[in-house]
Amino acid sequence: ASEGCVSGSTYADATTDDFQYTYQLVKGDAEIITKLDSATTVDNHVFTGVMFRESLESGSKTAALGMSMVKISNETTWSTYLASRLETNGKISDISETIDSPANAEKAGIPLVSDLHFKSGADFNGTWFKLIRRGDTFTGYASDDGVTWTKVGSKTIEMAQDIYVG
C-alpha cells in the first residue's frame, strides 16, 4: 500500500520504535509541511511531529522533526528538534535531558530550537513543521506562523529512493 497507518505505542528506546504513524510512500526528493495545533500532556520528552522513514520496520533509518515537552511539570517548556537514526537498527538520537537546553542538545549532536511559542500558559498557539528531503540531506524548519521559518538543523542519511513520510 502507498499509504496507511502503523499503530502502537507502548515503549520505544534508542534502537526500537513503537508509536502511531500515518504515512504516505514518496519517491525521491519530497517535503512535508504541517501545523501542530495542540498536544496532549503524556510524559517527559514524548515526541510529536513528522518524519521520513526508510521502511515501516522497527529500527528503520529515520529523520524526525518534532517537539517534546521538556518536563511534564512545566507545561510551557517545549523544544523543537531534529532527531535521526543514521543506520538501520542503529540508535536514534537520545531524546531525554539532552533537550533540556540548547547547550545540552548541542553536546548530544541534536539540532534544537527552543524559542518558538507553541504554548503560552494554558493556551496553544501551535507550531508549523517543514521537513525536506533533497537527495540524502534531510533539513527541518519550524515556524510560529507558517511564513517565517527557523532552520532547526540538517542530517545526512543514506536512504532508498522510495521512503515513507508522515
Predicted segments with their positions:
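Extracellular glycan-recognition regions
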Residues: A1-G166
